[in-house]
Structures are given as C-alpha cells and as structure tokens.
Amino acid sequence: MKPQAKKTPYKRIALALSLCALLIWAILGTGASLAWFTDTSPEINNIFHFAGFDVEVSHRLTDGKWELIDGKTDVFDDEALYEPGYVQVVYLKVENKGTVPFKFDTAVNVNGCIKATNVFGQPFMLQEYLKFGIATADTEEEMKNSIPNRNTAVEIANEPLRNYYKSGSFELAPGGTKYIALIVRMPEEVGNVANYRGDTVPKIELGITVKADQITD
C-alpha cells in the first residue's frame, strides 16, 4: 500500500550546487589535452590555450555582468531551497578566443551526494527528483528572449538528471560566442518523497564539463 500524500513543511535544503569541477577537454588532431579547474588549484583559471585553441567560459551575475569561471566559482545558488516547483536558471557564455574552429558540448554530472530519509521513512537521493534542460543562443538578447518566463523554463527542463546529463554539440568559429541557459528544477508533482526528516540533510554536488573538439574538415 502506497503512503498517502500529505502536506508537510519542507525543511531548508542548502544544496552544494556549485561548479566544483570545470573540465575543458581539447582534442587537437593526434593528441588530447586536459585541464581541470578545482579549488585545489586556485592559480588556474578557466582560460585554456594550446596550439591555437583558446576557450573561455563565463557565467552571468545577478547584475547582468559576466564573470570568468574558476575553481572557486559558485555558479548555482548553493543556498537555494529546492522544493516541488522550484526552478533555477544559470547562464553561461562560451567564447572561442583562438584561431581554430571547434565543436563543444556541455554536460552536468553528479560528483557526490548524501542520501537522506524522507517523511515516509524511505531513503532517497536528490538527483532522482531533479530535471535539467539546456537552451542555447548566438546573442545575449536572443538568450534572454528564449526563456521569457518561468513556464518556458519548466517546458525546457524535462530531462531527468540521475547521474549525468549531456547537451548536443555546437560549433564555434574563431571569435565566436555561444550563450547557454542551464535550467534545473524539481517538478511540482514530486511531493513529500523528496522531503527529508531526521538529522541527515540531503546534498548533491554537481560538476560542469565543457568538452571541445577541433574541427579539422
């Protein structure tokens, strides 16, 4: 017999939804180069340059300005109260500062989590109840217009996260820029199955990966 749904106030869940690892992977012909950006190497920023390959990744602040991402950048709101119906949109900007064209994709993966117990006494993990979506644009204005309101964001973010979510591939010529809207939400229909009880607070740590491959054709 399934437990009956009931209204239970949601406890505050401070999720570690931060950019804990930004990986830029450049495949240049015969070799591959990897650059990890984590809080253990604060001197490394998000600018990766090798043999004409130069990519920068930024995120948009609340005042509309853009900030380059490094290993200590909190891209997601780590004080967000995730409950059914909550939606968050993060805007990224990928720039080709080099001299060679490349194609890239963006992925979100779960780097770590803490399992908790819900109000029904059942174990659960947050990634089981979060959904993601990605929208892209060639200009900042186009990006803003692509998600004019919350309802549009909800319609876009319909892919389950589970442990990994990946976008399609996008091409970027030298001097080009691509804007990305990354949407995370907890559907309203989730209910109390993701509402924890007890002393163990559910937690999830996400990483964002940007993989870029040189276009040789």
Named regions from a protein language model:
Residues 27-29, 36-40, 82-148:
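Surface-exposed interaction patch
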